[in-house]
Amino acid sequence: MAVYNYDVVVLGSGPAGEGAAMNAAKAGRKVAMVDSRRQVGGNCTHLGTIPSKALRHSVRQIMQFNTNPMFRAIGEPRWFSFPDVLKSAEKVISKQVASRTGYYARNRVDLFFGTGSFADEQTVEVVCANGVVEKLVAKHIIIATGSRPYRPADIDFHHPRIYDSDTILSLGHTPRKLIIYGAGVIGCEYASIFSGLGVLVELVDNRDQLLSFLDSEISQALSYHFSNNNITVRHNEEYERVEGLDNGVILHLKSGKKIKADALLWCNGRTGNTDKLGMENIGVKVNSRGQIEVDENYRTCVTNIYGAGDVIGWPSLASAAHDQGRSAAGSIVDNGSWRYVNDVPTGIYTIPEISSIGKNEHELTKAKVPYEVGKAFFKSMARAQIAGEPQGMLKILFHRETLEVLGVHCFGYQASEIVHIGQAIMSQPGEQNTLKYFVNTTFNYPTMAEAYRVAAYDGLNRLF
């Protein structure tokens, strides 16, 4: 058994692991990366964010082609199978792997591919694919192993008609009707994707509102859009059992209802990838969802072991995971890069997409903050009209006395890009965070960004 010594060992090469490894390496530390795959990138690159967003992009292009009057004049709408559309995602994955492998090489991070587990608080043993065991001894270890779909024990996920958000990428046909159980971010995103391919979607939600953490007006806009696009949303429902058939699936609900479809996609929750890490050897406890607890420095109860990304739970976003990993390494190398990551914009890649940052109306009302609202509807924006994307709006919440921007919520074309302008202003100190910035700034025309000026004027007009 070969033994290697490092300053920092990172478990997992997803966004959190990459952020941690790069920060530690750039600070001059000797770093090793361990990943169970033979390629870097983690679930984000291979099964999650990258393939699903590439898939969404292709589906959106198909939808634009089929709804554009100019193209419709040429011929009938074109429909593509799910496997055909998925091929575009596979190309992006290989490009991402190549890019990220280069990052590690340039920063002299050693890569170990195999199953890593703790022998003790400073030792990780890696069982490689060829059976060779490598021992990595480190001063500090960062757990960034990510998460996987939560699988209830009473559901047969080996059945050829039952999928989760990882295995759905192996779907070899296009179902006529699909049940999606779980209307969280992943469930809503896949509902949009399959609806865009002409699939009838039954979206089963165990809550009374879609994505209840969003501003209620944005959530309602998404619900309305879904209802117009072959997506039936069933709220306040819980599964009793899932019955797999040769030609489909029947979902039995506790309410007594039954839904039959060609396939079922399970999107109800995530589980941290900690079960194979040998956590009992280091005294770090995990909760019922396999997640570990960390403090504001991303340190666990063991002083030299840290955690970042999906494995620590909220907010379970790739963007946040990268910053959490970078901050965990910052706590170790003490180079001024640490920060507690809590000001993260939410990006939801439904069709149209959603993004927000800051407080929503419910939160501000509950806190008794005197706020006002400014709105810009995309149907009136020149750029949205040119792009043929009239659905959506930008909504700014601001303090009616100080004009401080308190929240930005966007639904529609380029929402995940638009939100960053509001994020930049909200991060400014003191009086520099003001709604007047949007009034006094010249925006390129025509752009989606100028929606900020329209919304700002709308908000100011409400004051008296």
From Swiss-Prot:
GO biological process, one term: 2-oxoglutarate metabolic process
Cofactor(s), names only, from the UniProt record: FAD
A GO molecular-function annotation: NAD(P)+ transhydrogenase (Si-specific) activity
Listed SUPFAM superfamilies: FAD/NAD(P)-binding domain, FAD/NAD-linked reductases, dimerisation (C-terminal) domain
Keyword terms, alphabetized: Cytoplasm, FAD, Flavoprotein, NAD, NADP, Oxidoreductase
Catalytic EC class: oxidoreductase
Gene Ontology terms: cellular component: cytosol
Cofactor, how bound (note): Binds 1 FAD per subunit.
Localization, UniProt: Cytoplasm
Predominant subcellular localization, coarse grouping: cytoplasm
The enzyme's E.C. designation: 1.6.1.1
Annotated FAD binding sites: D35, S36, R37, R38, Q39, V40, G41, G42, N43, C44
Substrates-to-products reaction catalysed: NAD(+) + NADPH = NADH + NADP(+)
InterPro entries, per the entry: Class-I_Pyr_Nuc-Dis_Oxidored, FAD/NAD-bd_sf, FAD/NAD-binding_dom, FAD/NAD-linked_Rdtase_dimer_sf, Pyr_nuc-diS_OxRdtase, Pyr_nucl-diS_OxRdtase_dimer, STH_gammaproteobact
Function: Conversion of NADPH, generated by peripheral catabolic pathways, to NADH, which can enter the respiratory chain for energy generation.
Family: Belongs to the class-I pyridine nucleotide-disulfide oxidoreductase family.
Protein name (Swiss-Prot/TrEMBL): Soluble pyridine nucleotide transhydrogenase
Native species: Pseudomonas fluorescens (strain SBW25)
